[in-house]
């Protein structure tokens, strides 16, 4: 009867273990599917970044206001698409974070478990990739601003034959009102001769300002996601710290248990030695007395 109950208990335990293992596997399968979706979205953002880079390089070689306007429209569309995709990525990351929190309530997947560490580690990896993307777009924004400033400076020199000071260039960039700063050239050369250059500068100004506005909004979304992922990374660090401490306690406990066992073995060994020694001494003491004992018995 005891064997029957014992076997039944073991069977139930095995079935429970199988159920928990199945839940854990399903848990991770769905998780990795969601992670792949986020990675695909990131690849799309990377492709758009490459397009923006190419458009920016092309824009540097263009001297026609109409062409600048076309490139501006193209870049505006690409930046808007980037912003849209990044917002979707942010929503998916938030969903992953929520799923990770729910996963910790599943038996066998609690804080510090291999499943929880895996999930947290993967999301942290996505965060690092996002940071690289954020840095890339920040770098592009800085390059566009610097290149725009250099272009305005060159155009000013081409029209006026004079090298503009820093204040003049900054005012041109800030206002975009090229005519106000090029009145002397207009009076000397005629409005028609420099109209295209003025239009080009204006288009570049509008393009840079619009793209910068969108890139700043994009940067804010990136910062929000970075904060989310940083919290996930901190949680992972805490989990790993607790696991390390637990492992240390386990190792220490194992060492202490081993020491106790060695001490126990040593104690038993010396007890045996003491008993044997006592028996030997008893026999040695008994031998001289044997003749007297034998006489008494007779």
From Swiss-Prot:
The chain crosses the membrane at residues 275-295. Residues 296-298 are vesicular. It is found in: Membrane. The modification N-acetylmethionine is found at residue 1. One of its GO terms (molecular function) is SNAP receptor activity. Residues 198-260 form the t-SNARE coiled-coil homology domain. Keywords: Acetylation, Coiled coil, Membrane, Protein transport, Transmembrane, Transmembrane helix, Transport. Its main location: membrane. It is a single-pass type IV membrane protein. SMART domains: SynN (SM00503), t_SNARE (SM00397). Residues 1-274 are cytoplasmic. It comes from the Eukaryota. One of its GO terms (biological process) is intracellular protein transport. CDD domains: SNARE_syntaxin1-like, SynN. Pfam families: SNARE, Syntaxin. Residues 25-155 form a coiled coil. GO terms for cellular component: membrane. InterPro entries: SNARE (IPR010989), Syntaxin (IPR045242), Syntaxin/epimorphin_CS (IPR006012), Syntaxin_N (IPR006011), T_SNARE_dom (IPR000727). Belongs to the syntaxin family. Part of the t-SNARE complex. Vesicle trafficking protein that functions in the secretory pathway. This is Syntaxin-125. It comes from Arabidopsis thaliana (Mouse-ear cress).
């Amino acid at each position: 009867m005891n064997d029957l109950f014992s076997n039944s208990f073991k069977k139930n335990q095995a079935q429970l273990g199988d159920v928990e293992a199945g839940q854990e596997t399903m848990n991770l399968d769905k998780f990795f599917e969601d992670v792949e979706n986020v990675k695909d979205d990131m690849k799309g953002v990377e492709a758009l970044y490459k397009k923006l880079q190419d458009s920016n390089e092309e824009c540097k070689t263009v001297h026609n206001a109409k062409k600048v306007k076309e490139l501006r429209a193209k870049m505006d569309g690409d930046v808007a698409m980037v912003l849209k995709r990044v917002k979707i990525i942010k929503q998916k990351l938030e969903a992953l974070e929520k799923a990770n929190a729910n996963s910790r309530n599943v038996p066998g997947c609690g804080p510090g478990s291999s499943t929880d560490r895996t999930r947290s580690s993967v999301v942290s990896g996505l965060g690092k990739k996002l940071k690289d993307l954020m840095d890339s777009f920040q770098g592009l924004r800085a390059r566009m601003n610097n290149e725009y400033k250099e272009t305005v400076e060159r155009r000013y020199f081409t029209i006026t034959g004079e090298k503009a000071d820093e204040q003049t260039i900054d005012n041109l960039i800030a206002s975009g009102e090229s005519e106000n700063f090029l009145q002397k050239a207009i009076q000397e050369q005629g409005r028609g001769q420099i109209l295209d250059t003025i239009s080009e500068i204006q288009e570049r100004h509008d393009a840079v300002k619009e793209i910068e506005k969108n890139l700043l909004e994009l940067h804010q979304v990136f910062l929000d996601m970075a904060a989310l992922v940083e919290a996930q990374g901190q949680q992972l660090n805490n989990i790993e710290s607790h696991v390390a401490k637990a492992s240390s306690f386990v190792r220490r406990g194992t060492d202490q248990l081993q020491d106790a066992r060695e001490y126990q073995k040593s104690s038993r060994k010396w007890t045996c030695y003491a008993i044997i020694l006592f028996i030997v001494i008893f026999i040695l003491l008994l031998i001289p007395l044997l003749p007297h004992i034998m006489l008494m018995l007779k």
